[in-house]
Amino acid sequence: MPVITVDLAVLPDRAVKQRLIESLTSAASQSTGIAEEKFIVLLNEMPRDNIGVGGKLLSDLVK
């Protein structure tokens, strides 16, 4: 079973997570020819205080 892992800042709600998982699964299935049912998608959410961009905390960059 193919696994898609995404590291990202905390998403605002369940609906956004669902759309992301559906989109990733669909794109991967179309690209590889592997059935959507075979894909596992893991979302690793991190607080914005734990992410740095250009030497700054993401929480300071996104308000």
Where does each model-flagged region fall?
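A domain-level signal for the structural core that forms small-molecule/cofactor-binding pockets
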Residues: M1-K63
